[in-house]
Curated annotation (Swiss-Prot):
One of its GO terms (cellular component) is endoplasmic reticulum. Keywords: Endoplasmic reticulum, Glycoprotein, Ion transport, Membrane, Transmembrane, Transmembrane helix, Transport, Zinc, Zinc transport. Residues 24-69, 121-126, 224-252, 312-322 are cytoplasmic. It comes from Saccharomyces cerevisiae (strain ATCC 204508 / S288c) (Baker's yeast). This is Zinc transporter YKE4. Zinc transporter whose role depends on the zinc status of the cells. It helps to balance zinc levels between the cytosol and the secretory pathway. It transports zinc into the secretory pathway in a zinc-adequate environment and in a high zinc medium. In high zinc medium, transport of zinc into the secretory pathway is a way to eliminate zinc from the cytosol. Under low cytosolic zinc conditions, it removes zinc from the secretory pathway and acts as a zinc importer that helps to alleviate ER stress. The gene is YKE4. The chain crosses the membrane at residues 3-23, 70-90, 100-120, 127-147, 203-223, 253-273, 291-311, 323-343. It is a multi-pass membrane protein. Glycans are attached at residues 184, 274, 285. The keyword Membrane applies.
Length: 346
């Protein structure tokens, strides 16, 4: 079976899991269990997936839902970090390299795809007050803008991307120290946004394991396929923003901690009141608040960090070379968006 079919199939099941685990459990407790069983019956029709899920259930996810969820989120966060080690050109840390430029373009596609195809639609799912969702997105954007501006004022810098946008070669000792340290506001904002995003993912994943082990495993596989291109794009943003390879790895580890925190919160919410509706209601409320806020932060990062890097010309004297480079960048933007569309295909 082709990889694209595998991804499409897995992700066609996962949204159902997350949907009834995070957004609809408040009103459809018995319906959720039926949906869980139905999803696993569908899985049985594909012997490869049935065998894989049974193997994982018997050899890896052998404990209760709390521990299974923690194990799953650790594996999910480890996979993208291992994946970046095999991408050529990332260790060189050359901000002008074509590889990094194309990865930044890919990250813009995945970022926009995540915002437009996943985060915002998920925020609007089952919500009657659309204005509140829009307000939360706006609040997220303004919060990241305020944080960015505050950090710039406190650090005494007016443009953290000076090496990209400025033609001046004079630097104060403070600016030189910041450059050596890989100091970049947008990169840190990307880390903060990643933490918030991973918290919501962790809550959803934990809820799926409390639905059933099989559903939790299916969700874990689907989320892994989703996270690899997403984390690869985030990694490219960090490198292009001035982080060294080890710094980017450490930053990704910090965002991974957010997923563990989110999973722990999800487990706590599901266990409160002996699996009563109170747990799933709290989980849904937390997710409804976090998702649109995260969308606002992601929009800020895309518009102030990623897009300016793509607009930057590395060889302004060669117009033909720049047009060829832009053509490749445009292709990678579409590829990134298409990957996220495939990941979120219902």
């Amino acid at each position: 079976m082709k990889a694209s079919h595998i991804c499409s199939y897995l992700l066609s099941i996962a949204p159902l899991v997350v949907s009834h685990g995070v957004h609809h459990n408040r009103d459809h407790g018995h319906e959720a269990n039926h949906e869980s069983k139905q999803s696993f019956l569908i899985l049985k029709q594909e012997s490869i997936f049935y065998s894989l899920v049974c193997f994982l259930q018997n050899h890896l996810f052998v404990l209760g839902p709390r521990y299974n969820a923690i194990v799953a989120i650790l594996i999910i966060q480890l996979m993208p970090c291992l994946f970046v080690l095999f991408v050529p050109g990332l260790r060189k840390n050359d901000r002008a390299s074509l590889t990094l430029s194309l990865l930044v373009s890919f990250s813009l596609g995945t970022l926009l795809g995540d915002i437009l195809l996943h985060v915002i639609p998920e925020s609007l799912s089952g919500v009657t007050d659309v204005t509140m969702v829009g307000g939360a997105i706006f609040l997220g954007f303004i919060s990241f803008l305020t944080l960015d501006k505050t950090m710039r004022i406190l650090s005494g810098t007016s443009n953290d991307d000076g090496s990209i946008h400025s033609h001046s070669h004079s630097h104060t000792p403070q600016q030189t120290a910041e450059k050596k340290a890989g100091f970049n506001m947008s990169a840190y904002l990307n880390v903060i946004s990643g933490i918030a995003h991973h918290i919501t993912d962790g809550i959803a994943l934990a809820t799926s394991f409390y639905s059933s082990t099989q559903v939790g495993i299916m969700t874990s596989i689907a989320v892994t396929f989703h996270e690899i291109p997403h984390e690869l794009g985030d990694f490219a943003i960090l490198l292009s923003s001035g982080f060294t390879f080890p710094q980017a790895i450490r930053a990704q580890a910090v965002t991974a901690f957010g997923a563990v925190v989110g999973t722990s919160i999800g487990c706590w919410m599901n266990e409160i009141g002996n699996n009563s509706h109170k747990a799933t209601s709290s989980s849904a409320n937390a997710s409804e608040l976090m998702l649109p806020f995260t969308a606002g932060g992601l929009i800020y990062i895309a518009t102030t960090s990623v897009v300016p890097q793509i607009l930057h010309s590395s060889a302004p004297d060669s117009k033909l070379r720049e047009f060829k480079k832009w053509a490749l960048q445009l292709v990678f933007i579409f590829v990134g968006f298409a990957v996220m569309a495939l990941m979120d295909e219902h």
